[in-house]
Amino acid sequence: MLPRGSRVRTRQEHALVGRSGRRVRAGSIVVHSVQTDVDGPPRAGFVVGRRVGNAVVRNRVRRRLREQTRSRLSSLPPGTAVLIRALPDAAGSSSADLGRSLDSAFRTVRSPRPQRSARSG
């Protein structure tokens, strides 16, 4: 279980991160991230929809994601909020696969966004 201060808990927080955040797909997960308050610890929330499987499968995927995230959350900058959404393929993924996907996504989240060039036209 993640500590209380390290969780995205409310519906408003989930909506903020999901709608206005940066989105990164890695393997069988999608990670939405947004920089919130600078002083707070990094926080994580999880979304595992019905398309992933029945309740037993969804809870297993959520537990695996939570455990893999717990050890990696401190690698994110302070004040970062992430929402980790499992895709249907996550049901067949091992914990190691989910961990590799999280590593890849978190690497992208930590990197600065590339500047978009202005289009002429």
From Swiss-Prot:
Q: Which Pfam families match?
A: Ribonuclease_P
GO CC annotations on file: ribonuclease P complex
Q: Which SUPFAM superfamilies match?
A: Ribosomal protein S5 domain 2-like
Q: Name one GO molecular function term.
A: 3'-tRNA processing endoribonuclease activity
Q: Where is this region: Disordered?
A: 1-20, 91-121
Q: Which reaction does it catalyse?
A: Endonucleolytic cleavage of RNA, removing 5'-extranucleotides from tRNA precursor
Q: Name one GO biological process term.
A: tRNA 5'-leader removal
| Keyword terms of this UniProt record | Endonuclease, Hydrolase, Nuclease, RNA-binding, tRNA processing
InterPro entries, sorted:
Ribosomal_Su5_D2-typ_SF, Ribsml_uS5_D2-typ_fold_subgr, RNase_P, RNase_P_CS
Family, as annotated:
Belongs to the RnpA family.
The job of this chain, per UniProt, is described as: RNaseP catalyzes the removal of the 5'-leader sequence from pre-tRNA to produce the mature 5'-terminus. It can also cleave other RNA substrates such as 4.5S RNA. The protein component plays an auxiliary but essential role in vivo by binding to the 5'-leader sequence and broadening the substrate specificity of the ribozyme.
HAMAP family the record matches: RNase_P
Q: How does it assemble?
A: Consists of a catalytic RNA component (M1 or rnpB) and a protein subunit.
UniProt-recorded name of the protein: Ribonuclease P protein component
Species this protein is from: Parafrankia sp. (strain EAN1pec)
Its gene is rnpA
